A protein has these predicted regions:
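ANL superfamily adenylate-forming
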Residues: 30, 114-161, 176, 185-188, ...
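Conserved AMP-binding A3 loop
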Residues: 34-36, 165-193, 197, 201-202
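AMP-binding/adenylate-forming catalytic core of the ANL superfamily
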Residues: 92, 109, 271, 383, ...
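Conserved pre-ATP/AMP-binding loop-to-beta segment of ANL
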Residues: 22, 151-169, 176, 212-221
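Conserved AMP-binding/adenylate-forming core of the ANL superfamily
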Residues: 24-56, 62-68, 72-76, 93-98
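Gly/Ser/Thr-rich phosphate-binding loop
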Residues: 172, 243, 265-273, 284-346, ...
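Structural core segment of the AMP-binding/adenylate-forming
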Residues: 80-146, 478-480
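Conserved AMP-binding/adenylation subdomain of ANL enzymes
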Residues: 188-224, 229-269, 284
Length: 535
């Protein structure tokens, strides 16, 4: 099911802001750009991609950088000409960026100085466009401002709803990140539906309070606190802002006190981030009560489960700021369930209710049979927003997408008698640290490359701030020694910093095993939680 009058593609979707083109759209430090300026710069980049790089419909263009306005220009330019946007994780190191570029077969890379430095020595045949830095320091690279001239119109390209729009990489239990391919219809459907449901929810009051905070209306404004390479950032922040005429304020890096100052300066009305951000910004305000954040009416979270205690505290201490939670995955374009206001306060552990019209949620057993209310099983989602496939991985696609369009999420949960979803566990061997999905197998593979390591097991342990932290227990080869510092230095060249385990135990004997001979990861996790006093 989909909306009949939905824009046919992202190119059409980007035309919404033209009715108020002079309004502010992006703010970064001392720079402010109107909707019209953003569209014109994006159109200018689109012409460069076609005229200078020969990009045509279906070609892939990758980009990776901090949350800069150029990220927005890149996404809009690429998708508007029928090419496929490949936003790569800006925390990745050189090997990881190389994998994303090679696997996606990207023809051009757009990046800032940090990313270009990490890519030195990798895929040098791919031309690069440098953002906010000196392009002459890098090979095969030109400067963004040297080649992009604003243009009032995008190049004429026919883009169909079922054409591929994006490839976003997500960590999976198999180790290597999987490229999640989504169509224009799937991507556009997500923000359109949020906007519609948000408008409806603000009109409904329970006990005198609205079910949701307004995301549109008079001078709506949000902060891009989460990375744009995640669907929470790209969809719930960026794309949703286009249809709601919302201004986006960029941060160079997350800092809760700086967020308070930006809220005061720009009169920010709502903020969406991982749960840690919501908690930290409210705690920062306790410590800095002189900063005026009265404009802030909504605090939403996604990317990881928000602790019920946080929601209860927000309701009690900040009743004027409506709490919202959402559940979705890269494979569903961040779309599945949500809850806010009184519906959330009455059941703070819920992941929300399926979004009407577009989403169906059910619980399945291992054989794929439907389960009833309050029965524990795997969460399955059927939605117009679901992805099309995993890039170059038909086997993995078929494992999670059936012929009727149901996506098996890998999350374990229940649906209560009222239809609300509760996430209880994960089937997949993944740790979610501050909203980042980390495949344990990927980290284990990197650890195994060290010559002193005989066996390694990586798992997550609870953390109040980040949700989970990475831990590892390692069995050393006979006669070998290894310190936590040496291991961290070894891994730093191979994987992103956030993937390096924060708790490490070494032992000389073998790791414990279950009856089948597999490493007893569950037991080690339980032992670690006890030892750390987290149970």
């Amino acid at each position: 099911m989909y909306f009949a009058n939905l824009p046919q593609n992202l190119r059409d979707y980007f035309q919404f802001p033209l009715i108020h083109g002079e309004w502010d759209f992006l703010a970064y430090e001392d720079e402010t750009f109107s909707y019209q300026e953003v569209l014109n710069t994006s159109a200018g980049l689109a012409h460069v991609l076609i005229d200078q790089y020969g990009i045509k419909k279906g070609d892939k263009v990758a980009f990776s950088m901090r949350n800069y306005p150029e990220w927005i220009y890149s996404y809009m330019a690429v998708t508007s000409i029928g090419a496929v946007a490949v936003p790569l994780n800006s925390w990745w190191q050189g090997e990881e960026l190389d994998y994303g570029l090679t696997h996606s077969e990207s023809s051009v890379f757009i990046g800032d100085e940090e990313r270009l430095q990490r890519l030195e020595g990798y895929v040098e045949d791919i031309p690069r466009i440098a953002v906010r830095c000196d392009a002459s320091k890098f090979t095969n690279t030109v400067g963004f401002n040297d080649v992009v001239t604003p243009n009032e119109a995008f190049p004429e390209v026919v883009v169909d709803p079922e054409d591929d729009a994006s490839i976003m990489y997500t960590s999976g239990s198999t180790g290597y990140p999987k490229g999640v391919v989504s169509t224009h219809r799937a991507v556009v459907s997500a923000p359109e539906t949020w906007a519609l449901m948000g408008q409806l929810a603000t009109q409904i009051e329970v006990d005198g309070e609205p079910l949701a905070s307004p995301i549109s209306g008079e001078n709506p404004c949000t902060i891009a606190a989460v990375p744009l390479f995640h669907v929470t950032g790209s969809h719930a922040v960026f794309l949703l802002s286009l249809v709601t005429a919302r201004k986006i304020v960029f941060m160079y890096k997350w800092d809760p006190v700086e967020a308070l100052h930006l809220i005061e300066k720009h009169k920010v009305t709502d903020m969406t981030g991982v749960p840690t951000m919501s908690a930290e910004v409210l705690q920062a305000h306790k410590d800095n009560p002189e900063i005026d954040i009265s404009s802030l009416k909504g605090l939403g979270s996604g990317g990881a489960a928000r602790p019920p205690e946080q929601i209860k505290a927000q309701e009690k201490e900040h009743p004027d700021k409506v709490a919202t939670v959402g559940y979705g995955l890269t494979e569903t374009n961040a779309h599945a369930t949500n809850a806010s206001g009184i519906t959330l306060y009455e059941r703070p552990s819920t992941a929300g209710y399926p979004t009407p019209f577009l989403n169906l949620i059910k619980i399945m057993d291992e054989e794929g049979n439907d389960l009833g209310p309050n029965e524990l099983g795997e969460v399955a989602i059927k939605s117009t927003c679901n992805f099309r496939c995993y890039l170059k991985n038909e086997e993995a696609t078929n494992e999670v997408l059936d012929s009727e369009g149901w996506f098996r999420s890998g999350d374990v949960g229940i649906i209560d008698d009222d239809g609300f979803l509760y996430i209880k566990d994960r089937i997949k061997d993944i740790v979610i640290r501050g909203g980042e999905n980390i495949a344990c197998l990927e980290i284990e593979a990197a650890i195994y490359e060290h010559p002193s390591v005989r066996e390694a097991s990586v798992f997550g342990v609870p953390d109040e701030r980040l949700g989970e932290k990475l831990a590892t227990r390692i069995s050393l080869n006979p006669g070998k020694e290894l310190t936590e510092e040496d291991l961290s230095s070894f891994l730093a060249a191979k994987i992103a910093k956030f993937k390096i385990p924060e708790y490490t135990w070494f032992q000389n004997d073998e790791l414990p095993k279950v009856a089948a001979g597999k490493i007893a990861k569950k037991q080690m996790r339980e032992d670690a939680i006890k030892e750390l006093g987290l149970g």
